[in-house]
Amino acid sequence: MKTAIFTVVLALAVFAVLSFGWEANEKALSEEFTELIHEKEAASETEARECRYFWGECHDHMPCCDWLVCRYKWPIAYNICVWNRTFPEK
């Protein structure tokens, strides 16, 4: 009877250690994944935009993209980029 109880306790201890290891591995993978996502976001944010997109605020130092033109719109108190009825070439 003592050996059966000892075996059960030992098996539970092994399962606890294995599940802790699995959980630690899963957490490490999750942290690695979130770090990768943050790196991708940071890389896209650091790229300087050469032009302003649709409905973006524009000035002389912030030009619109090729298929947009900078116009003053009355309800809005600043110039915005609007479509000039052309399409960008790819």
Swiss-Prot record:
Tissue and organ distribution: Expressed by the venom gland.
Signal peptide per UniProt: 1-19
UniProt keyword annotations, A-Z: Disulfide bond, Ion channel impairing toxin, Knottin, Secreted, Signal, Toxin
Localization per Swiss-Prot or TrEMBL: Secreted
Pfam family, one: Toxin_12
GO molecular function, one term: toxin activity
Function: Ion channel inhibitor.
Family per record: Belongs to the neurotoxin 10 (Hwtx-1) family. 13 (Hntx-13) subfamily.
Protein name per the record: U7-theraphotoxin-Hhn1g
